[in-house]
Amino acid sequence: MALNIPFRNAYYRFASSYSFLFFISWSLWWSLYAIWLKGHLGLTGTELGTLYSVNQFTSILFMMFYGIVQDKLGLKKPLIWCMSFILVLTGPFMIYVYEPLLQSNFSVGLILGALFFGLGYLAGCGLLDSFTEKMARNFHFEYGTARAWGSFGYAIGAFFAGIFFSISPHINFWLV
């Protein structure tokens, strides 16, 4: 059985490349997030657990919002572009807002981080996967082959994240 990867299909190229780049950007900081929080910022296990649970709860709310809005938008991309804008702000947010707030006012940092990560990454992953699946159905390509580029991107990003993290975690944030 031959694998059919339709590189000539512009919609496939968009979905695959966006997925690839999204997951690279996510893995550059997320793959070592807990290590950064505990080792670099000195958060306790309780603070880590609280942070993760609030992040996930907030992302569930944004997933519902994204789902309702994107269903109405169909294949229009305003939410995708909003999410892209949030991703571009990762470096400045992590270094100049999130890190100082977690160290000086944990509760405010917790809330702002949950909003940022929910909008950009945690719920954004579901938005991207749903959008890619809709594109696959409408423009005749396999969702799995397009989504595989995201997994490949995450693996590449995680590999380089470890290298850059050993130099400075801030490098990872700026590379996003």
What are these regions (language model features)?
Residues D71-F85:
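Cytoplasmic membrane-interface "Motif A"-like loop-to-helix N-cap segments
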Residues G157, N172-V176:
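Symmetry-related core transmembrane helices of the 12-TM Major Facilitator Superfamily/SLC fold
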Residues Q56-M64, Y154-A155, F159:
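Residue-level signature of mid-helix packing/kink "hotspots" within the transmembrane helices
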Residues A2-I60:
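Helix-loop boundary and gating motifs at the non-cytosolic
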Residues L61-L75, F164-S166:
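Helix-to-loop junctions at the C-terminal end of transmembrane segments
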Residues G113-W149:
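Cytoplasmic helix-loop-helix junction between adjacent transmembrane helices
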Residues F85-S104:
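C-terminal ends and interior cores of transmembrane alpha-helices
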Residues A34, Y66, I156-F165:
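Small-residue (Gly/Pro/Ala) motifs that create kinks and tight helix-helix packing interfaces
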